[in-house]
Curated annotation (Swiss-Prot):
<dbReference type="InterPro" id="IPR050293">
    <property type="entry name" value="LIPOR_BchN/ChlN"/>
</dbReference>
<dbReference type="GO" id="GO:0046872">
    <property type="term" value="F:metal ion binding"/>
</dbReference>
<keyword id="KW-0560">Oxidoreductase</keyword>
<dbReference type="GO" id="GO:0016730">
    <property type="term" value="F:oxidoreductase activity, acting on iron-sulfur proteins as donors"/>
</dbReference>
<protein>
    <recommendedName>
        <fullName>Light-independent protochlorophyllide reductase subunit N</fullName>
        <ecNumber>1.3.7.7</ecNumber>
    </recommendedName>
</protein>
<feature type="binding site">
    <location>
        <position position="114"/>
    </location>
    <ligand>
        <name>[4Fe-4S] cluster</name>
    </ligand>
</feature>
<comment type="function">
    <text>Component of the dark-operative protochlorophyllide reductase (DPOR) that uses Mg-ATP and reduced ferredoxin to reduce ring D of protochlorophyllide (Pchlide) to form chlorophyllide a (Chlide). This reaction is light-independent. The NB-protein (BchN-BchB) is the catalytic component of the complex.</text>
</comment>
<keyword id="KW-0479">Metal-binding</keyword>
<dbReference type="GO" id="GO:0036070">
    <property type="term" value="P:light-independent bacteriochlorophyll biosynthetic process"/>
</dbReference>
<comment type="pathway">
    <text>Porphyrin-containing compound metabolism; bacteriochlorophyll biosynthesis (light-independent).</text>
</comment>
<keyword id="KW-0602">Photosynthesis</keyword>
<keyword id="KW-0547">Nucleotide-binding</keyword>
<keyword id="KW-0411">Iron-sulfur</keyword>
<keyword id="KW-0408">Iron</keyword>
<dbReference type="GO" id="GO:0016636">
    <property type="term" value="F:oxidoreductase activity, acting on the CH-CH group of donors, iron-sulfur protein as acceptor"/>
</dbReference>
<comment type="subunit">
    <text>Protochlorophyllide reductase is composed of three subunits; BchL, BchN and BchB. Forms a heterotetramer of two BchB and two BchN subunits.</text>
</comment>
<feature type="binding site">
    <location>
        <position position="28"/>
    </location>
    <ligand>
        <name>[4Fe-4S] cluster</name>
    </ligand>
</feature>
């Protein structure tokens, strides 16, 4: 088996982190419903919020109302906000109407929003009451998608965390993959693990309620997304044990992630090499094509999705880029520690957001590529900076070997576009 790539320069695990608590510019956790409702095929997400919440979901999902999507919004009217109506009774009526019309729903999530949190609406009590009423056909859970103190990927974390306490108990030794991935990417991961003889493998979230995984003291789990800190804590409380590894972005990250699982399950070096050699070679070849554009280019990450640290590791080590600043909404060293170990010392690490101060640092650095939110991209482009929308990195399949070239290409394309525009202007 090929040995892991070693870092000559010291890593960033012990690098001082610049803490920022100023003005923020991010989407709220409701955004996670866009990919969760596609993954969980018999679940429904009922947001208790305002018309703004409804417009966000409708426009972001690109789903027509008549398509019967698996999400909706119970609108809080002025009388609800003023306390002139019993919001709990209103929720009961809406849920009863929904379930009578949609008997295919097996899991119902009551999702809190900024308005429901401001008026202290107890959705946990509503979920318990409604579960008693509609059990065993429907389980009702709740979580918050509010953007008051969170960023948009934390919606998935809150959703999965709400599921962990009600997962069935099991004594079986099983591998649990934690995090929502597109089906085609998840199938690739399961296929590689199956070829190594690793199993049984379960997934959280499961596509259907009847496939919900169990959890117990013999459960080991591997995390697919770096923003699932609270879900990991909930699994730890249930007795499960996490497999520590870098996240599976790029050839190196995917190999180290799979290697950690293989070692846990006693897979031989020969078997591991036989299973991974071909996809690793394809990944390296695909990355190399994009790396020609990215090599020796500088990059600046605004905090947005919590993917920033693993992506910076991938871009600096596999694509030859230089990171100036790597900002993340939250830095969970328990999860991204292995990626920090591989990220060579040098870039500023910042946690949280003070958007004006970060804009000043970005303008002073003049990076070749800036990864930021939608609201910052156009103004920075107007100032002559090349940008990449951070949210695209969440909605695009980017995990594991077969997507490694696509991941590198996402960063190469805006640089190529800028270079082409400069050539056209020069002509």
């Amino acid at each position: 088996m090929n040995k892991p790539v070693t870092t000559i320069a010291p890593g960033c695990r012990d690098t001082p982190i610049l803490k920022q608590r100023g003005q923020r510019e991010v989407f709220c956790g409701l955004t996670g419903i866009i990919w969760l409702h596609r993954k969980m095929q018999d679940a429904f997400f009922l947001v208790v919020g305002s018309r703004t919440c409804a417009h966000l979901l409708q426009s972001a999902a690109g789903v027509m109302i008549f398509a019967e999507p698996r999400f909706g919004t119970a609108i809080l009217e002025e009388k609800d906000l003023a306390g002139l109506a019993d919001a709990q009774d209103e929720i009961d009526r809406e849920v009863e109407r929904l379930l009578s019309r949609r008997p295919d729903i097996k899991q119902l999530f009551l999702v809190g929003s900024c308005p429901s949190e401001v008026i202290k609406l107890d959705l946990g009590r509503a979920a318990e009451r409604l579960t008693r009423k509609f059990a065993p056909h429907v389980r009702v859970l709740n979580y918050s998608g509010s953007g008051i103190e969170t960023t948009f990927t934390q919606g998935e974390d809150a959703c999965l965390e709400s599921m962990v306490p009600v997962l069935p108990e099991t004594e079986a030794r099983e591998l649990l993959l934690v995090g929502a991935l597109p089906d085609v990417v998840e199938d690739q991961a399961l296929g590689l693990l199956d070829k190594m003889g690793i199993g049984p493998v379960r997934v959280l979230p499961a596509p259907r309620a009847d496939g919900t995984p169990g959890v117990g003291p013999n459960t080991v789990y591997a995390v697919l997304q770096p923003f699932l800190g609270e879900t990991c804590s909930a699994l730890d409380r249930r007795g499960a044990r996490r497999i520590d590894a870098p996240f599976p972005f790029g050839e190196e990250g995917t190999t180290l992630w799979l290697r950690a699982i293989a070692r846990e399950f006693g897979v031989s070096d020969e078997t591991f090499e036989a299973v991974t050699a071909a996809p690793r070679a394809r990944a390296r070849k695909a990355i190399a094509a994009a790396a020609e554009t990215l090599r020796d280019k500088s990059i600046f990450f605004f905090p947005d999705s919590q993917l920033e640290i693993p992506l910076a590791r991938f871009l600096t080590r596999e694509c030859g880029m230089a990171a100036i600043e790597v900002g993340a909404p939250y830095i969970h060293k328990g999860l991204v520690g292995p990626d920090l170990d591989l990220l060579a010392a040098g870039p500023t690490l910042s946690e949280g957001q003070d958007v004006d101060m970060q804009l000043d640092r970005c303008r002073a650095a003049r990076p070749d590529l800036t990864v930021c939110g939608l609201g910052l991209a156009n103004p920075l482009e107007a100032e002559g900076l090349t940008t990449k929308w951070a949210i695209e990195l969440v909605f695009t399949p980017v995990h594991f070997y077969e997507q490694a070239g696509d991941l590198a290409g996402l960063f190469a394309r805006p640089i190529r576009r800028r270079e082409k525009l400069r050539l056209e202007v020069a002509e």
